[in-house]
């Protein structure tokens, strides 16, 4: 277990910034719904789902002007016996940070560092938004990239829009005898989790708790669903997607070992593009990837242009930031070992570890 020295407590409210309470819930929901900068992860549904499923307390810092919310910063107090503590915006998300009037970013960032001290978190991580530039903050602009592209007018045009080499892979997959189902019931959830758990085990990383997927599906309602590709009635690829303001984001997806030969993952993403268009979406948000990683180049092969993302981190004096980067050299041997674990053991132990990787 990681041990940290006590961090001095500090007053929180200042510069028109305060910690939201239960009475602010309706105001926060309205602000997020009306704010052009808000992502799916800024929605209160995400904040509550992560807290409910994994126990990471959700907090919202409010910057107010004239009695109205001008900007806000949602955060999770992430705790793990293996990876330590951190105040993160936002837990298990690829986006986060301040939304609203960017003039309040500095004050909200300062308040976040004071909240971190109060919660004994030695670091604060902001995954997007206008970033603070004060003492102790470090901004990275080259570690991750986002990938978003418009959806085509129909299925044929969508296939044609895929670059030639990748389009050939999709065509090979479509020629195989596979079926696709979309839903969010118990059967869809069970198939998705089984496929996803095997997929991440094969990559050498622990699987998130099943409760997290269920909580997100329950909280988002019709704004989340599962698309599964089946071969001989067995699930071989599956993805849980989020829908937000005309964009679909395939968020948790993967395939079993057999999926590669079947090109099931290629079929999965193509069919999701077509399905999203029938739901009224006009954009496909492929999410973020670490720069120059395998996923980064996979998305480029689909014709998506990388857009650099800016993240910020603050660390208390004398404290070390947590390291949850799976590409870190310190985890190389552990990843190789995890890939060899029997699936039953990986699925039992994995959620106990991955719950702290928010």
Regions found by a protein language model. Name each.
Residues 62-66, 72, 93, 106-115, ...:
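Aromatic (often tryptophan-rich) hydrophobic motifs at membrane interfaces
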Residues 103-148:
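Non-catalytic accessory segments adjacent to catalytic cores
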Residues 69, 92, 118-120, 140-143, ...:
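A short, structural micro-pattern
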Residues 78-95:
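Conserved acyl-donor/pantetheine-binding loop and adjacent beta-alpha core of acyl/acetyltransferases
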Residues 95-101:
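The substrate-binding groove and active-site-proximal loops of carbohydrate-active enzymes
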Residues 7-8, 15-66, 73-83, 128-146, ...:
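A conserved beta-strand-loop-helix scaffold within acyl/acetyltransferase catalytic domains
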Residues 56-58, 118-121, 279-281:
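Short, high-confidence coil segments that cap the C-terminus of an alpha-helix
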Residues 2-12, 77, 133-157, 282-358:
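Active-site/acyl-donor-binding loops of N-acyltransferases
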